Amino acid sequence: MSEGVDLKELKRRMDGAIAAFKHDIASLRTGRASANVLDPVTVEAYGSRMPLNQVANITVPESRMLSVSVWDKSMVGAVERAIRESNLGLNPIVDGQNLRIPLPELNEERRKSLVKVAHDYAEKSKVAVRHVRRDGMDDLKKAEKDGEIGQDESRAQSERVQKMTDDVISEIDRLLAEKEKEIMQV
């Protein structure tokens, strides 16, 4: 008798959806400074577009300030332009080879739009988890149809897959609620 569906593999794929969600919401700017805020910024450098963290070092010297130390002095202008044009609402101040970026207070409208973006990220992750669940259920149906597992085993495994799915989705909801609270905190 075969085991029907590889639960460890399904769990690994669902955990991947959680990890992607955590990465997505980490880049959402809250009231506190975080180097992740600049993750979406790409710089025109050496003939191609590169992530900011590949041409500069990003630090958080104060709770409402980011510091970007550009490694190549000739890139300072391109880095400043990339940050200004990134639609993050940031205005860097050039200081030699460094850029200081004060983080303004978020207004109510901006906070609500960030919460909406967080909800979109959560929904995208839930859809990914449901796709993994569907793949697992399809594998179970095929194994049962091919006679690899019995009906009782198929039912038991499908319940385990459903429980795993419910647990992962509730973890995504918990992380979303946490991030929403963090964003709305004044």
Swiss-Prot record:
SUPFAM superfamilies in UniProt: Ribosome recycling factor, RRF
Region (Disordered): 135-164
GO biological processes: cytoplasmic translational termination
Location relative to the cell: Cytoplasm
Keywords per UniProt: Cytoplasm, Protein biosynthesis
GO molecular function per UniProt: ribosomal large subunit binding
GO cellular component: cytosol
Family of this protein: Belongs to the RRF family.
Function: Responsible for the release of ribosomes from messenger RNA at the termination of protein biosynthesis. May increase the efficiency of translation by recycling ribosomes from one round of translation to another.
Cited PANTHER family: MITOCHONDRIAL RIBOSOME RECYCLING FACTOR PSEUDO 1 (PTHR20982:SF3), RIBOSOME RECYCLING FACTOR (PTHR20982)
UniProt-listed NCBIfam families: frr
Protein name: Ribosome-recycling factor
Organism the protein comes from: Rhizobium meliloti (strain 1021)
